[in-house]
Regions:
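A contiguous loop/helix-start segment that scaffolds small-molecule binding in enzyme catalytic cores
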Residues: 2, 157-228
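Glycine-rich, flexible N-terminal cofactor/catalytic loop recognition
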Residues: 1-59
Length: 228
């Protein structure tokens, strides 16, 4: 009997954004692979889902991947989730999917159970109407960061990236220093789908000033869009 790995999107804030198919998938899976078992437990408890969880995160090594592959080889149904949103986008899910494809090939099925993505939500709310854009995820903290910043400045396409509350002010300081052409529009989305969802529009300098006044109270993840 062949196993199956399903890539399941989960809410990025509002638990009501869970799809019916995702709920059924999590209930029927033999195990749920999750980035942080404590975060996923909150979601599972809300929907009274009793499926056992297995941690899989950025520090999981080959032994953990081998264990997951063994489960698939024995016919188990596994659901992969991230802390929020769609697995494989700026999280370790992609590494696992790649390893499963490499080691098992067509011996098992890999399916997508799509749903919420902070990337898609922010782009749709921007009002820009992005036909093409460059997505950079989270910029590296040190090595390669300056190269990526130059790429943002020189890209012919609009750019979308993620940032945490700990580094959003630093990022905007760096964007301000890049000296974009006059009229360059930036949108920063914060706490998407949550109670305190908010948006900032303007130049990097204008948004930096707005966020600096609230720096001590900044929470959540940020999506930054730079229109070209």
């Amino acid at each position: 009997m062949s196993g199956i790995l399903r890539i399941v999107a989960t809410p990025i804030g509002n638990l009501e954004d869970m799809t019916l198919r995702a709920l059924r998938t999590l209930k029927e899976a033999d195990f749920i692979l999750c980035e942080d078992t404590r975060t996923t437990k909150h979601l599972l408890d809300h929907y009274q889902i009793k499926t056992s969880t297995i941690s899989y995160h950025q520090h999981s090594g080959e032994l953990k991947i081998d264990r997951i592959i063994d489960l698939l080889n024995t016919g188990k149904s596994l659901a992969l989730v991230t802390d929020a949103g769609t697995p494989g986008i700026s999280d370790p899910g992609g590494k696992l999917v790649s390893a499963v494809r490499e080691k098992l090939g067509n011996a098992i099925k890999i399916e997508s159970v799509p749903g919420v993505s902070a990337l898609a939500a922010a782009v749709s709310l921007s009002g820009v109407g992005f036909d093409r854009f460059l997505f950079l995820g989270f910029l590296p903290h040190k090595k390669g960061r300056q190269t990526m910043l130059k790429q943002i400045l020189t890209s012919e396409y609009s750019v979308v990236l993620y940032e945490s509350k700990h580094r959003i002010v630093k990022l905007l300081e760096e964007l301000s220093a890049l000296k974009f052409p006059d009229g360059t529009e930036v949108m920063v989305a914060r706490e998407l789908t949550k109670l305190f969802e908010s948006f900032y529009f303007g130049s990097p300098e204008e948004i930096l000033t707005a966020l600096q006044s609230k720096e001590s109270n900044l929470k959540g993840e940020f999506v930054v869009l730079i229109k070209k």
